[in-house]
Regions:
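Short S/T/G/P-rich N-terminal loop/turn motif that feeds into the first structured element of a domain
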Residues: 1-47, 53-87
Length: 87
């Protein structure tokens, strides 16, 4: 498994969380190879961990992330990493 890890700066927390629940979560969950996803926030910093069953699927999503981000956040980085353990 591989994880896509986007990090964002949030400019409007309420609007960003609404967009996340209504657009991002349904969108990523329909992506080929999707396994699960978690999104977290601390103050105006957001972090996602979107798990895919293959590196190819994760890389494909990492290339789509920038086009999915609303104007209420700034995309700071996107990484693809191998998942080495889970429980």
């Amino acid at each position: 498994m591989h994880a896509v890890i986007p990090q964002v700066t949030i400019h409007d927390i309420e609007a960003a969380e609404s967009y996340l629940r209504e657009q991002i979560v349904p969108g990523v969950s329909q992506a080929p190879g999707f396994v699960t996803a978690y999104f977290a926030r601390k103050e105006n910093s957001g972090l996602g961990m979107i798990i895919f069953d293959s590196e190819d699927a994760a890389r494909a999503m990492s290339e789509r992330i920038a086009s999915m981000v609303p104007g209420t956040v700034t995309l700071d980085s996107v990484e693809v990493r191998e998942v080495v353990a889970n429980s």
